[in-house]
Amino acid sequence: MDKPKYLKWIVEEAGVIENFNKTLKCFNIDYNNDAEVLDDWALHIRRHYISDQELEEECDLLGVSPEAYLRANIIPQKDEGLGPTARSNTISEILFSDLLEFIFEYHVPRCRQYNMSGKTVSEHGTDIVGYKFAKEDKKPSKEDRLIAAEVKAILSQNDASVINKAVEDSIKDEYRISLTLNYMRRKLRDMGKIDESNDILRFQFKTKAGHDYTIDYIAAGITSMPTLQKIKKGDKEVGIITGIDGASLAISDYRSIFFVHGKKLMELAHEVYERCKK
């Protein structure tokens, strides 16, 4: 999947949570009304739901335009029940997938939104799975890494409590990751993505001799907090994520927090989704 242009709007910040000394990655979405970038973002999202070839085939078969087909069958609409929620959740999951793949260089299979049974149906299991192989030939190594991310989005508010929710639900990934891996492997195979399906298979054998690897968990939260309050920390100026106390976060050493914020992100999500016409 090509790197989407909107990633140039995402700026990493020095962000902190009070009474919290574990890994925290903080990003601000500093966007504008560049139609080319917004259209590219919309196309990027649409391709998670249905491929170019399948969209063309469906439109030819039914005798409808791509826009009409997408609106009726694929893309959640803001005036539908759960439509805004589906838009918020999906654009957020794809954003964090893009960060992990294009910034942190994990391979992140894209199959979660493909061939859903309904426009607002949410798949169960771990939200995002990514991986890295230590060896170029992909032979199992204990240095291989698997990452599992739980995403929580509140795009209509600027409430940092989304981080608490992400941490709480991320703990569940320790128990559901095996089921998610099995589901992903089979779905990727059905999509014809055989190489990715085989990659996932490697990570289903953690307990097999010679197949151990490292697994990391991410609690990812996103909200419409426009800016962070700046404070001095040593000789550096950092942004403090207010409204949350790190002492309340029961987080282990192999779990980290990603936080993304920006102004009026629900409006941005609708702007992008309304462009999903082709």
Briefly describe each language-model feature range.
Residues 120-132:
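Charged, often glycine-rich, active-site loop that binds/positions anionic groups
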Residues 157-232:
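Acidic, metal/cofactor-coordinating or nucleic-acid-engaging core segments within structured domains
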